[in-house]
């Protein structure tokens, strides 16, 4: 899960609370203090609350729980005098902008802005493929702003540079250029250009020194571009409400032009009795309203009003979860079922334990991934898809563990990797327990995988046989099907699949179904 870095003093300033009080309140939010270095905290937050990816979002939630500020966060909406003129950019057709006025920034505030930007890029933005975000000092921009293509021969001063360079040089000279220029037409990339002709940003690669945010900035322009209209709007909502925590006047101006942005609250009609039954505790109407407001929602005639930055709230069940969180899980009733029973381990659990011991003894490292995953799993099987995913990271129910292991090996960036996972996958409409392992090193072959499976079957006392098999994602003639008391497959992964998953080392994988 995402881990964010915040200063204790900044959280204290944003909430008006002492750190000792803040630490106690973490029991009531979806977050956990991972480490405390004295002046700074590392806080683990959940993927479904991207508004918690910075100190401002955490402060907003904490103030609600502490009843310092309750109900919908205050916002004063208006129309900006800045105009956006947008061309049709096929690879990133959606763009929305807003200005947050009267912000007070210091070094820590700018750190939090950058952290929120990068965390959204990494998770919700799918590594800038789905959305890209920019911040600009309004006082340094001459409107109107043009969203159009430029030439790679054009010059600008990239962030961190002292003098102008050509855009094509920026691709090679900067880490961002090397990493993200492949997402766009490199010869004629999309950019924001103001009326004076200065390039504000090459999207989604790197911004410009010309209008960067500093501690002297008072009015911040936010832009979000992307491939999905809803994702662009959701990201802009999160960014607006985050910066509002630094604004004295709570003024936000929506920039007209492009695909636009509509600030809208969501109404969810909630049956209070259903919430009480769902949580197993009777909640009086007055208390229900109190909990709703502490969660930074509002209540009107049977409907709960959800602010636009709470993109994880999709139904009354999500509202019930927030009620439980702000009420405190320690308020939930606890009962021991009055059912006499003699427990024993299920056969699948016995095999799972022995499999783990065996894999660890053979030098493998165990991983634990989520059952919900992204579209990459479709490289090796046909997954069931989530109808209303909250994030591009969790759009499918995994039908294989293989792609998650390859992605993990890619992230580790080692020349030799031996990893495994035991967990659930869905095959042919049924949930089954699977063991998957990966061997990644120069010279890795099918023989390496066969050796591990044979050793495993021998240790477990299981009979297994091997037969030739083929799959699109495997190298031709380099795959074996496992049959017997356990079933599955072993294969050398096709380099094209490895490239798609950003892994460059020869790799052998296996997946065995053990229960």
Curated annotation (Swiss-Prot):
Gene3D superfamilies: 3.30.56.10, Bira Bifunctional Protein, Domain 2, Phenylalanyl-trna Synthetase, Chain B, domain 3. It holds the Pfam family B5. GO terms for molecular function: ATP binding; magnesium ion binding; phenylalanine-tRNA ligase activity; RNA binding. Signal peptide: none annotated. HAMAP family: Phe_tRNA_synth_beta2. Its cofactor is Mg(2+). The keyword Nucleotide-binding applies. The gene is pheT. It is found in: Cytoplasm. Residues 263-334 form the B5 domain. Belongs to the phenylalanyl-tRNA synthetase beta subunit family. Type 2 subfamily. PROSITE patterns: B5 (PS51483). Mg(2+) binds at residues 312, 318, 321-322. One of its GO terms (biological process) is phenylalanyl-tRNA aminoacylation. This is Phenylalanine--tRNA ligase beta subunit. It catalyses: tRNA(Phe) + L-phenylalanine + ATP = L-phenylalanyl-tRNA(Phe) + AMP + diphosphate + H(+). One of its GO terms (cellular component) is phenylalanine-tRNA ligase complex. It comes from the Archaea. Keywords: Aminoacyl-tRNA synthetase, ATP-binding, Cytoplasm, Ligase, Magnesium, Metal-binding, Nucleotide-binding, Protein biosynthesis. NCBIfam families: pheT_arch. Its EC number is 6.1.1.20. Tetramer of two alpha and two beta subunits.
């Amino acid at each position: 899960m995402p881990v964010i870095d915040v200063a204790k003093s900044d959280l204290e300033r944003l909430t008006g609370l002492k750190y000792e009080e803040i630490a106690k309140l973490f029991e009531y939010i979806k977050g956990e203090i991972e480490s405390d270095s004295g002046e700074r905290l590392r806080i683990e937050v959940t993927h479904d609350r991207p508004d918690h990816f910075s100190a401002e979002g955490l402060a907003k939630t904490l103030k609600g729980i502490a009843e310092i500020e309750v109900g919908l966060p205050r916002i004063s909406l208006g129309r900006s005098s800045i105009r956006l003129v947008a061309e049709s950019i096929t690879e990133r057709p959606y763009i929305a902008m807003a200005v947050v006025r009267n912000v007070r920034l210091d070094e820590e505030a700018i750190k939090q802005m950058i952290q929120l930007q990068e965390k959204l890029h990494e998770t919700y933005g799918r590594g800038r493929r789905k959305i890209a975000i920019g911040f600009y000092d309004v006082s340094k921009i001459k409107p109107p702003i043009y969203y159009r293509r430029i030439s790679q021969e054009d010059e600008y001063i990239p962030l961190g540079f002292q003098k102008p360079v050509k855009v094509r040089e920026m691709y090679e000279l900067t880490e961002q250029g090397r990493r993200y220029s492949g997402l766009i037409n490199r010869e004629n990339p999309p950019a924001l250009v103001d009326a004076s002709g200065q390039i504000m940003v090459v999207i989604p690669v790197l911004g410009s020194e010309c209008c960067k945010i500093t501690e002297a900035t008072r009015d911040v322009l936010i832009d979000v571009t992307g491939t999905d209209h809803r994702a662009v709007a959701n990201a802009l909502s999160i960014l607006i409400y985050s910066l509002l925590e630094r604004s004295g006047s709570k003024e936000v101006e929506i920039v007209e032009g492009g695909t636009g942005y509509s600030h809208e609250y969501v109404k969810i009609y909630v049956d209070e009795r259903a919430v009480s039954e769902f949580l197993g505790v009777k909640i009086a109407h007055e208390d229900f309203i109190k909990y709703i407001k502490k969660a930074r929602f509002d209540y009107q005639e049977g409907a709960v009003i959800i602010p636009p930055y709470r993109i994880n709230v999709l139904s009354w069940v999500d509202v019930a979860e927030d009620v439980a969180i702000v009420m405190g899980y320690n308020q939930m009733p606890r009962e021991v079922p009055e059912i006499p029973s003699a427990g024993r381990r299920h056969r699948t659990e016995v095999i799972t334990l022995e499999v783990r011991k065996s894999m660890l003894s053979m030098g493998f490292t165990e991983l634990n991934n989520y059952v919900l995953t992204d579209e990459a799993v479709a490289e090796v099987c046909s997954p069931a898809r989530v109808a209303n995913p909250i994030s591009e990271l969790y759009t499918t129910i995994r039908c294989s563990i293989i792609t998650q292991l390859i992605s993990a090996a890619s992230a580790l960036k080692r020349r030799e990797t031996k990893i495994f996972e035991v967990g659930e996958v869905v095959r042919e409409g049924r949930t089954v327990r699977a063991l998957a392992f990966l061997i990644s090193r120069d010279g890795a072959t099918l023989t390496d995988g066969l050796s591990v499976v044979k050793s495993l079957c021998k240790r477990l006392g299981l009979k297994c046989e091997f037969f030739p098999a083929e799959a699109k994602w495997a190298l031709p003639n380099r795959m074996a099907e496992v049959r017997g008391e356990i079933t599955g497959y072993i294969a050398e992964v096709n380099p094209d699949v490895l490239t798609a998953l950003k892994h460059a080392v020869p790799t052998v994988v296996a997946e065995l179904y053990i229960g």
